[in-house]
Amino acid sequence: MYGIEYTTVLTFLISIILLNYILKSLTRIMDFIIYRFLFIIVILSPFLRAQNYGINLPITGSMDTAYANSTQEETFLTSTLCLYYPTEAATEINDNSWKDTLSQLFLTKGWPTGSVYFKEYTNIASFSVDPQLYCDYNVVLMKYDATLQLDMSELADLILNEWLCNPMDITLYYYQQTDEANKWISMGSSCTIKVCPLNTQTLGIGCLTTDATTFEEVATAEKLVITDVVDGVNHKLDVTTATCTIRNCKKLGPRENVAVIQVGGSDILDITADPTTAPQTERMMRINWKKWWQVFYTVVDYVDQIIQVMSKRSRSLNSAAFYYRV
């Protein structure tokens, strides 16, 4: 009898010990699985994009309702506007207080006194050599001149777009343009650009690489030149480096905080023919030639419409920054 009781107790104890061992083993296995799973989740979470589900709040009202931007009407309170005009405008107006008058008129359109800056430039040529567009919004007035039509078009292409540029060493290297957005931009007091296309043996095509007089002249004594050649073909260049600097540039896209207003002229400047130029007619405008007072009155009257087709940008443009990143 006692032997049976001892056997029963011993069997019970062994069962308890075995159960405890099994439970501990299961606990260790579950801990391993859980911690390994959490570890994998932590490692992969930076590389995954998942929806973060929160409290399910009911949405009342129509989702199609148009809500006005609360800052849209306050644009002028925190922004600056630069108005660039030629010297002849100030000469014709001949009034020492004309800027104050215009500032008061801009105030009636929502631009506080001190937020509008009047920037004078001597002529298109000098402005193209050293463009300085520092304001949130920049409006450039260019009076049409048939003799400067090319410079005006290239200046518009320069300031209405952003460019990434690098220096060129034309004495050591041949250069080629990789695509239509790749241009060579030259600036200086007098830029004469000659090019000689090369074949795969680096021999001149229709020119002699050792004789610059046989090169094809693409620009003569200009202040600003945007040179476009056949893509994928090496070229040897001859540039008047004493009075001109040339850069290898890539057009990145539109500079949306700049607008150009052509004043007068029977021909309308249009740079949208370039396949790399997105339609920019909204930021390149024209008004009929009148007295300069009337021109400025027109700009003030339509400043709201002009600004609406522009976008505020923080990146400025000057001739130094232009060469590297605009």
From Swiss-Prot:
Signal sequence, renumbered to the chain: 1-50
| Pfam families recorded | VP7
The GO terms describing molecular function are: metal ion binding
List every stretch annotated CNP motif.
165-167
The entry's localization annotation reads: Virion; Host endoplasmic reticulum lumen
Q: Which example biological process does GO assign this protein?
A: receptor-mediated virion attachment to host cell
Region: GPR motif, residue numbers: 253-255
Q: Major place of localization?
A: virion
Q: Which residues cross the membrane?
A: none
* Residues annotated as binding Ca(2+) 2: Q177, D228, V229, D231, D301
Residue span of region LVD motif? 237-239
Q: Provide the residue positions that the database annotates as binding Ca(2+) 1.
A: D95, G206, T214, E216
* Keywords carried by this UniProt record: Calcium, Capsid protein, Disulfide bond, Glycoprotein, Host endoplasmic reticulum, Host-virus interaction, Metal-binding, Outer capsid protein, Signal, T=13 icosahedral capsid protein, Virion
Q: Which GO terms describe its cellular component?
A: host cell endoplasmic reticulum lumen; T=13 icosahedral viral capsid; viral outer capsid
Q: Which cysteines are joined by disulfide bonds?
A: C82-C135, C165-C249, C191-C244, C196-C207
Q: What else does UniProt say about it? A: Some rotavirus strains are neuraminidase-sensitive and require sialic acid to attach to the cell surface. Some rotavirus strains are integrin-dependent. Some rotavirus strains depend on ganglioside for their entry into the host cell. Hsp70 also seems to be involved in the entry of some strains.
Partners and quaternary state? Homotrimer; disulfide-linked. 2 Ca(2+) ions bound at each subunit interface in the trimer hold the trimer together. Interacts with the intermediate capsid protein VP6. Interacts with the outer capsid protein VP5*. Interacts with host integrin heterodimer ITGAX/ITGB2. Interacts with host integrin heterodimer ITGA4/ITGB1. Interacts with host integrin heterodimer ITGA2/ITGB1.
**Family that this chain belongs to:** Belongs to the rotavirus VP7 family.
Function noted in UniProt: Calcium-binding protein that interacts with rotavirus cell receptors once the initial attachment by VP4 has been achieved. Rotavirus attachment and entry into the host cell probably involves multiple sequential contacts between the outer capsid proteins VP4 and VP7, and the cell receptors. Following entry into the host cell, low intracellular or intravesicular Ca(2+) concentration probably causes the calcium-stabilized VP7 trimers to dissociate from the virion. This step is probably necessary for the membrane-disrupting entry step and the release of VP4, which is locked onto the virion by VP7.
Which protein, by its recorded name, is this? Answer: Outer capsid glycoprotein VP7
Identify the taxonomic lineage of the organism of origin: Viruses, Riboviria, Orthornavirae, Duplornaviricota, Resentoviricetes
